[in-house]
Amino acid sequence: MEINRMSTLRIASSVLVALAVFGQADVVTNIRDATRPDADKVRDAGRKPTDVIHFLGVQEGAIVMDVMASSGYYTEVLAHAVGSQGTVYAQNSPMMLKYRYGFYDKALTQRLKDGRLANVVRLDRDMSDLGIPSGTVDLAMTALNFHDIYNSAGEAAALEFMSDVYGVLKPGGVFAVIDHVGSADGDNNRLHRMDEAVMRELIARSEFQLDASGDLLRNPKDDHTGGVFAPDLRGNTDRFLFRLRKPK
């Protein structure tokens, strides 16, 4: 009787693993087969979207959020990954949408024009006032923006932001943070970078658990002393990738 029960458990476990693997394969295929803007594809070499999505465990049909979506590079990647049965929230604060004379607002509007990416919902609102129910999102991610919160507004604001993300996630949900690596003694505000040790400290002080960190976007040739928009660095900076999890 015990042997039969153990065999059943092993089979069930194998089925779940297979479903997860096939689900991830479908997600990667969705992205690779998608008709995406040429400008986005040029950035793929440095951003490795399929590798990142696979690392984060995004599944078809998931409800996800691109936090501080800017012009929507990752919004589009996520939209193709989760498929027609999924939902992507593209969040930008009103202040961010006014930046550079409305550049991000115009770029995101163009990206979603004529019903492109029908599974994307714009949230032109602050994280503290999203207007959606709490505990309803499977995964949220923010890419190359977290440094702006910490460098401009400080530790308390960064922790408050993380708490806002925590609130919108389902139990067991994932929060991914990608950013340009800075140094402890560098002018990270001017360089648009984030000291990795500081990020780890913020994670430790937040409600999240550190689930994993990835080396997919690391570049040892970047010594962290140059601005991220410098021609020889732009699109190819050394970047950390953290996968945080809200406890179940």
Language model features: what each stretch is:
Residues 27-55:
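Class I SAM-dependent methyltransferase Rossmann-like catalytic core
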Residues 61-70:
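Conserved class I S-adenosyl-L-methionine
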Residues 79-80, 156-171:
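A short glycine-rich, Lys/Arg-flanked "PGG" loop and its adjoining helix->strand segment in the class I
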Residues 100-130:
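S-adenosyl-L-methionine
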Residues 112, 187-213:
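Conserved Class I S-adenosyl-L-methionine
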Residues 130-141:
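A short acidic, Gly/Pro-enriched loop at the edge of an enzyme's catalytic core
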Residues 172-180:
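Conserved beta-strand signature within the Rossmann-like core of class I S-adenosyl-L-methionine
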Residues 206, 221-248:
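Core SAM-dependent methyltransferase catalytic element
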